[in-house]
């Protein structure tokens, strides 16, 4: 048996000393700490001083709850504790942030007279945009409930307000101008081009999500190398085709705010894709295909 000293990462005060064996997992140690601190295990983060960061007082969080504590503890048998604050499930956050656009976007479409002080018949492009925007978020909610398997059960509750503000606010920004009485419809060829790109993006995005789901057995946090179709070319094709989808939406609506939303989303997805690409290379090493790009086939 080994006594593990757990110290607050911020105050450096000792939280307590906990007995562990060579078979004690991180999750089991969290339960011991939870019993003493009366905090839920989802709020507890355990870390060790970073061996790679040059920043002072930098820490590296321990791995999965299934990892052995002995794998991480150094010679001084000390771990550092941080309270992550109130948590909320990933799926609930996603449902809330995706449900908002389904209510916000139609407000500008159906209540034009109340919002703009005047009304006009909706063009074909405006009708198509309403359907596309709504179907995108209906699809996202469906995937959250029935498709995605999350490696982490919860996230800080602050993310609920941050994420909802982004999606709901951007929806209002896009819908206000697309549904404006003075809106000028794009040439019909451009509308169909944008619609075609949107459909291709949405269909392949769903296919990518099904492929990712099939990589991870239910209730598991196991990671495997994604393979097949677009995954042979880029690490995150689900982001690639979602960007394509929003480009299509921007072409069919031809509004500046649609392009701004598409670019904002693309920038964020690029950041996520770079992070995932690096994690794949770090985790799988030489097994990971060297020719596979991050987001754009053969280029980036």
Swiss-Prot record:
Taxonomic superkingdom: Eukaryota
Main location: endoplasmic reticulum
Glycosylation sites: 163, 238
Catalytic activity: a very-long-chain 2,3-saturated fatty acyl-CoA + NADP(+) = a very-long-chain (2E)-enoyl-CoA + NADPH + H(+)
InterPro entries xrefs: 3-oxo-5_a-steroid_4-DH_C, SRD5A/TECR
Gene Ontology molecular functions: oxidoreductase activity; very-long-chain enoyl-CoA reductase activity
Keywords, sorted A to Z: Endoplasmic reticulum, Fatty acid biosynthesis, Fatty acid metabolism, Glycoprotein, Lipid biosynthesis, Lipid metabolism, Membrane, NADP, Oxidoreductase, Steroid biosynthesis, Transmembrane, Transmembrane helix
Keyword Chloroplast included in the entry's annotation: no
Cited Pfam families: Steroid_dh
Residue ranges the record marks as coiled coil: none
Pathway where it operates: Lipid metabolism; fatty acid biosynthesis
Annotated membrane topology: Multi-pass membrane protein
Chain ranges passing through the membrane: 91-111, 191-211, 243-263
PROSITE patterns in alphabetical order: S5A_REDUCTASE
Enzyme Commission number(s): 1.3.1.93
GO cellular component term of the entry, any: endoplasmic reticulum membrane
Top enzyme category: oxidoreductase
Location of the protein in the cell: Endoplasmic reticulum membrane
GO terms (BP aspect): fatty acid elongation; steroid biosynthetic process; very long-chain fatty acid biosynthetic process
Family statement drawn from the similarity comment of this UniProt entry: Belongs to the steroid 5-alpha reductase family.
Function according to Swiss-Prot or TrEMBL: Catalyzes the last of the four reactions of the long-chain fatty acids elongation cycle. This endoplasmic reticulum-bound enzymatic process, allows the addition of 2 carbons to the chain of long- and very long-chain fatty acids/VLCFAs per cycle. This enzyme reduces the trans-2,3-enoyl-CoA fatty acid intermediate to an acyl-CoA that can be further elongated by entering a new cycle of elongation. Thereby, it participates in the production of VLCFAs of different chain lengths that are involved in multiple biological processes as precursors of membrane lipids and lipid mediators.
Protein name: Very-long-chain enoyl-CoA reductase
């Amino acid at each position: 048996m080994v006594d593990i000293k757990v110290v607050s990462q911020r105050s450096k005060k000792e939280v307590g000393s906990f007995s562990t064996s060579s078979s004690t997992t991180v999750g089991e140690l969290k339960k011991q700490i939870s019993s003493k601190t009366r905090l839920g295990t989802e709020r507890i983060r355990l870390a060790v001083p970073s061996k790679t960061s040059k920043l002072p007082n930098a820490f590296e969080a321990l791995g999965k709850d299934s990892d052995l504590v002995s794998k991480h503890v150094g010679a001084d048998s000390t771990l550092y504790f941080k309270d992550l604050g109130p948590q909320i499930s990933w799926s609930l956050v996603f449902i809330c942030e995706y449900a908002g656009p389904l209510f916000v976007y139609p407000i500008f479409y159906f209540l034009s007279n109340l919002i703009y002080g005047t009304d006009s018949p909706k063009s074909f492009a405006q009708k198509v945009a309403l359907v596309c925007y709504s179907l995108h978020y209906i699809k996202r909610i469906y995937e959250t409930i029935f498709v995605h398997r999350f490696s982490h059960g919860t996230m800080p509750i602050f993310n609920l307000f941050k994420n909802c503000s982004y999606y709901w606010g951007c929806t209002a920004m896009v819908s206000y101008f697309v549904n404006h009485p003075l809106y000028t419809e794009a040439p019909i060829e451009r509308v169909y081009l944008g619609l075609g790109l949107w459909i291709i993006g949405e269909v392949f995005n769903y296919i990518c999500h099904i492929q990712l789901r099939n990589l991870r057995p239910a209730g598991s946090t196991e990671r495997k190398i994604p393979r097949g179709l677009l995954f042979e070319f880029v690490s995150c094709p689900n982001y690639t085709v979602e960007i394509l989808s929003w480009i299509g939406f921007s072409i069919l609506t031809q509004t500046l705010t649609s392009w701004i939303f598409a670019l904002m989303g693309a920038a964020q997805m690029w950041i996520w894709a770079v992070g995932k690409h690096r994690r794949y290379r770090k985790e799988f090493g030489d097994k990971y295909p060297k020719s596979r790009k991050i987001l754009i086939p053969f280029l980036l």
